Design a protein with these regions (language model features):
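Intrinsically disordered, low-complexity serine/threonine-rich segments
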Residues: 5, 9, 18-21
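PLP-dependent amino-acid enzyme catalytic core
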Residues: 15-444
Length: 444
């Protein structure tokens, strides 16, 4: 459900003490990300092997292309965030070996990456999370961090946790680790690009990247440019959190007034300043928006057909392949599946949204005559494949008609047209409310 943030979603950070040094337009020197990304990649090898780059036969056959999935959902913490967290901490400790405490504010993948890094380097981590953080995310962060990490539940909203984290850093001399708006984090994420080229043996024709705060996209694109790789890029944002699109329109990061938090790994209200410095010259046409309900269809397909569990943000790159079908035919395409930290308690919501988007489930209000046999009359016009998924009715003794909320599932979009015709022929008055977002958010 949309909300009004001040800086971003779960894994965002207010633009605190950010002085970009990566782009001339910000009055700074360009970083040689080619060497730094390779150094980051080498450092990561002591922690885990390169994530698989897998040719997907199903998607390749569907689009007449060579579709490769860069499986960042298979890192030790099931997301690419471990790369930036480890590299940033490594760089800090190289310059300040006696730095003992690292802090972040996050209820998502960044927290788990920081927890893993703290345990690896033997440093203390303090992770601030909102009190409302699901128990599953708290427990997973504790597992990755072990005794090295302390979790502090503070505030009902992310911004309150962030403020507490910043206050703690100021008071205790701790080092704050940003989820994306940090050059060392961006260099760490660029290790994804190093691995892609090494594993494929050449640069692919196209790379499709998810975008939230922009750290991954900035790192991968910067490395490809540094090694003169001729690949095209497509950047995918959730429709309800298009922070890169907003920044490109005016040439600078903007804070979105509202963000849909469903794609929690990319629900960012403001793209990182350092990230945008590396992305500010991309064509606006290269940025694609993915509707949240369509992402659910992609998640279910990847789960049911491929056996791959992706979180909403992790499915972004695959989700836009139908939109790119004409552009990728006969080409090699790498889609970065950025994360697989999916809480299966959300599966009913994902299925619900996917069915609605696909036109296989509808909700409507039916005015039902309050007479004996009226319900039986309605049930008689249902088709053999029409399944009642929801039925709510409260009889009004002083009225001739009562309102019924009905949810119907079917296996063909054509079934609803036929059902509505039969309802009209039978004299039933109804209103389709499937596309009413206010009601939909209440029902799901």
């Amino acid at each position: 459900m949309p909300h009004a943030p001040s800086a971003g979603g779960d894994d965002t950070v207010a633009q605190l003490r950010i002085f970009p040094r990566v782009c001339p337009q910000y009055g700074c020197d360009m970083t040689d990300i080619r060497d730094s990304a390779r150094s980051a990649t080498q450092a990561l090898r002591s922690l885990f092997e390169p994530t698989p780059l897998q040719r997907n036969e199903h998607l390749s056959a569907r689009y007449g292309a060579d579709i490769w999935l860069k499986r960042e959902d298979l890192t030790p913490v099931r997301s690419y965030k471990i790369r930036g967290a480890v590299n940033a901490m490594r760089k800090v400790l190289a310059q300040t070996p006696d730095q003992e405490v690292f802090v972040c504010a996050s209820a998502g993948n960044h927290a788990q990456g920081v927890a893993f890094a703290c345990r690896h380097f033997g440093k203390r981590g303090v992770i601030f999370m909102p009190v409302t953080t699901p128990r599953q995310k708290i427990d997973k962060t504790r597992i990755f961090g072990g005794d090295a990490v302390e979790i502090r539940l503070t505030g009902d909203y992310f911004d309150q946790s962030l403020a507490a984290a910043q206050a703690y850093c100021a008071a205790e001399g701790a080092h704050f680790l940003s989820p994306f708006d940090d050059d060392d984090v961006i260099e760490g994420q660029a290790s994804v690009a190093v691995e892609i080229i090494e594993q494929l043996g050449q640069a692919p024709d196209m790379v499709v990247l998810p975008v939230g705060g922009g750290g991954l996209a900035a790192g991968v694109r910067s490395y490809f440019r540094a090694v003169d790789a001729p690949s095209d890029f497509r950047y995918v944002e959730p429709l309800g959190g298009a922070s890169l699109t907003a920044a490109l329109k005016v040439g600078a990061p903007q804070t979105l007034p509202r963000v849909d938090s469903f794609v929690d790994g990319a629900a960012v209200a403001r793209i990182g300043t350092r990230s945008f410095a590396r992305l500010s010259d991309i064509p606006r046409s290269s940025v694609l928006l993915a509707p949240e309900d369509r992402i659910c269809v992609t998640m279910l397909e990847m789960l049911n057909v491929e056996g791959i569990v992706l979180e909403p943000a992790g499915a972004l790159a695959v989700d836009v392949l139908p939109v790119l079908a004409d552009q990728i035919r006969g080409k090699s395409v790498v889609c970065v599946t950025s994360g697989g930290n999916f809480d299966f308690e959300r599966l009913p919501e994902v299925k619900e949204r996917a069915l609605r988007f696909s036109g296989l489930k509808k909700y409507f209000i039916l005015r039902l005559p309050q007479r004996p046999g009226a319900l039986r009359d309605f049930l008689g016009i249902l088709g053999p494949d029409d399944d009642i998924a929801r039925f709510e009715y409260l009889k009004k003794s002083a009225r001739n008609f009562g309102s019924v909320l009905i949810g119907i599932e079917t296996n063909s979009t054509d079934s609803f047209a036929a059902l509505f015709r039969r309802m009209e022929d039978a004299g039933f008055d109804y209103r389709d409310i499937t596309e009413d977002e206010t009601l939909a958010n209440f029902l799901v």
